[in-house]
């Protein structure tokens, strides 16, 4: 078996979110190795939880600096989300990456088996409603990518891959072409357009959990739920009433919306369940 593990990116600014994530991850994945990739330098609070939640802390500052340099070329300043690129040069041969604005609702071990068929696997892809969060309409006229490459447009909050699939050298080699497409990228989504570009131009097999389920009819594959979908029901730390198992709940965009409107996030009771999971009762 390959050296397998999972990564998450966080800092102390999102400590509450990180605790909810960690509680949920360890509730369903008690033994898989886990590594924190620092979003920035302010990680003292979350790093102090490493013993309680059994995770390591990324130490290769040079590789994080490399990620920051890439983000500056797209945004003019360092953007912590780009540190996700470091994981292809990390300690795990095969790995899962999960965004921290999630709660994990199942064992993620099944995802590694899909690396027999794929070099890159995300949660969702090939949905027209997602494409606008990766590429602007103008990308088609640019002619640099095929329609299939553009339509892949994956949510990169959940990624399964292996080390050789995206080496730092291969990223460097394709950066000039990626930068040439920057005006066609939805850079308000930070690293997501670049990572999509790197995935679809890597020469490997790429897909998504949703795509695998649809192609094979295997609807027992756990799938991501988006908190913006108001049709879901939750109870006792679970999503209930769905015909497919739930992999995780993702509040992508919903925390920012809640802050802007002064309202609670959707399914706050699910998030609170995991945020308070290890707190003493009474």
Segments (PLM) and residue ranges:
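Short internal beta-strands
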Residues: 34-40, 123-124
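Active-site-proximal specificity loops/subdomain of glycosyltransferases
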Residues: 45-90
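GT-A fold catalytic core of metal-dependent nucleotide-sugar glycosyltransferases
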Residues: 82-132
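A glycosyltransferase accessory/donor-loop signature
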Residues: 1-4, 155, 163, 168-282
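Short, charged/polar "capping" segments at the starts of alpha-helices
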Residues: 16, 41-47
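Short, acidic, metal-binding catalytic loop of nucleotide-sugar glycosyltransferases
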Residues: 24-32
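Conserved catalytic core of nucleotide-sugar-dependent glycosyltransferases
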Residues: 113-177
């Amino acid at each position: 078996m390959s050296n397998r593990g999972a990564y998450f990116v966080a800092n102390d600014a999102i400590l509450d979110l990180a605790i909810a994530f960690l509680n949920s991850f360890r509730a369903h994945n008690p033994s898989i190795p886990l590594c924190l990739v620092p979003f920035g330098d302010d990680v003292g609070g979350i790093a102090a939880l490493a013993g309680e939640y059994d995770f390591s802390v990324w130490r290769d500052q040079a590789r994080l600096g490399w990620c920051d340099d890439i983000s500056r070329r797209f945004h003019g300043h360092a953007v912590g989300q780009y540190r996700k690129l470091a994981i292809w040069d990390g300690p795990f041969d095969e790995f899962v990456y999960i965004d921290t604005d999630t709660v994990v609702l199942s064992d993620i071990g099944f995802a590694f088996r899909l690396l027999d068929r794929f070099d890159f696997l995300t949660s969702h892809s090939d949905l027209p409603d997602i494409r606008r969060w990766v590429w602007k309409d103008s990308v088609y006229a640019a002619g640099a990518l095929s329609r299939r490459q553009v339509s892949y447009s994956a949510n990169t909050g959940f990624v399964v891959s292996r080390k050789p699939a995206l080496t730092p050298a291969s990223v460097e080699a394709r950066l000039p072409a990626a930068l040439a497409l920057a005006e066609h990228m939805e850079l308000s989504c930070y690293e997501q357009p670049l990572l999509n570009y790197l995935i679809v131009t890597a020469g490997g097999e790429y897909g998504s959990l949703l795509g695998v389920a649809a192609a094979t009819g295997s609807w027992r594959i756990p799938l991501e739920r988006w908190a913006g979908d108001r049709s879901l029901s939750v109870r006792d730390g679970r999503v209930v009433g769905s015909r497919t198992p739930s992999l995780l709940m993702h509040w992508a965009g919903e925390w920012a919306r809640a802050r802007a409107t002064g309202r609670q996030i959707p399914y706050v009771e699910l998030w609170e369940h995991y945020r308070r999971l290890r707190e003493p009762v009474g």
